[in-house]
């Protein structure tokens, strides 16, 4: 997997111009440029996709505003900060390369040949993925715990690699990608279960998918109970036939399987929400769930 982290000056200026101002000096530069070159400023809006599609060869139709921005002291200061930030991002990525490679070989089961992250100021607080295989990253890094940052990078990568689904089925895609990144991958990074993390509105769907997800991961039938205990997600084992073919699928195929079989997966379960809440705080599995 070839993942690149680059600073492209045109992309950096574009996001500084068209996102919320990150400082008073930047706001003043933008206001001055708007007052002096309103038409040119408006025309630059369409440059974003052109820059990202062919960033190595991009030449603006009109470079007036870009050049003024490049020459400003405030931009030079930000440019140095962004390069320092880029090196920090690369250090986090490289440090976790082995466990990330396992994510793609064992969990996603799909190669990401090449992906480019355009690094911008973290003061912009942005993750943007406007075109395939390219994304903008500019968010704070928690120095004490870089795991969250790594998870967000990989959410972008995996979401980008999977086809689009219709609105009705999109929750299945989002939920299963969360299972892969925010739950299984995060558990591997932290050496503890992270299966209660994720979008609250998707938790009920996640509980329905979870037994099949364990089969997809290749967890043996006689270990399902211990995984249920570890992850604190209750389901009735006797209600599920063990689907041996799931372990042969990649993530996108598993999403398709769940969508095709959703009327069987989303079933009435005897385990109530009250029992689940109680179960999540227990150290032993109650017999009625076994």
Identify the function of each model-found stretch:
Residues 199-290:
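Pan-zinc metallopeptidase signature
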Residues 1-44, 105, 164-236:
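Post-HExxH zinc-binding segment in Zn-dependent metallohydrolases
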Residues 137-153, 167-172:
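Short pre-active-site segment immediately N-terminal to the catalytic Zn-binding motif
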Residues 73-135, 191-195:
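Auxiliary, metal-adjacent structural segments of Zn-dependent hydrolase domains
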Residues 50-82:
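Long, hydrophobic/aromatic-enriched structural stretches that serve as scaffold segments
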Residues 149-164, 180, 184:
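Catalytic glutamate of the conserved HExxH
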Residues 86-94, 143-144, 171-175:
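Short, charged/polar micro-motifs that form catalytic or ligand-binding hotspots
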């Amino acid at each position: 997997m070839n993942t690149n982290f680059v600073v492209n000056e045109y992309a950096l200026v574009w996001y500084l111009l068209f996102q919320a101002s990150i400082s008073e000096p930047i706001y003043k530069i933008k206001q001055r440029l708007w007052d002096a070159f309103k038409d040119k400023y408006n025309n630059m809006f369409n440059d974003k996709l052109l820059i990202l599609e062919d960033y190595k060869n991009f030449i603006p139709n009109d470079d007036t505003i870009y050049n003024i921005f490049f020459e400003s002291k405030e931009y030079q200061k930000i440019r140095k900060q962004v390069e320092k930030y880029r090196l920090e991002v690369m250090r986090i990525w490289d440090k976790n390369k082995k466990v990330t490679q396992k994510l793609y070989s064992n969990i996603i089961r799909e190669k990401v040949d090449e992906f480019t992250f355009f690094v911008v100021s973290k003061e912009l607080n942005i993750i943007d993925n406007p075109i395939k295989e390219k994304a903008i990253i500019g968010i704070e890094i928690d120095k004490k715990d870089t795991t969250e940052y790594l998870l967000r990078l990989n959410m972008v990568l995996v979401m980008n690699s999977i086809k689009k689904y219709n609105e009705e089925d999109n929750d299945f895609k989002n939920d299963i990608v969360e299972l892969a990144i925010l739950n299984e991958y995060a558990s591997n990074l932290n050496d503890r279960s992270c299966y209660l993390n994720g979008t609250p509105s998707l938790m009920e769907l996640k509980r329905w998918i979870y037994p099949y997800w364990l089969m997809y991961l290749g967890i043996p039938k006689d270990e399902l109970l211990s995984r249920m205990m570890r992850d604190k997600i209750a389901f009735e084992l006797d209600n599920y036939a063990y689907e041996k073919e799931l372990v042969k699928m990649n993530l996108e195929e598993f999403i398709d399987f769940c969508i095709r079989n959703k009327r069987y997966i989303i079933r009435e379960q005897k385990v109530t929400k009250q029992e689940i809440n109680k179960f999540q705080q227990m150290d032993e599995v109650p017999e009625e769930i076994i």
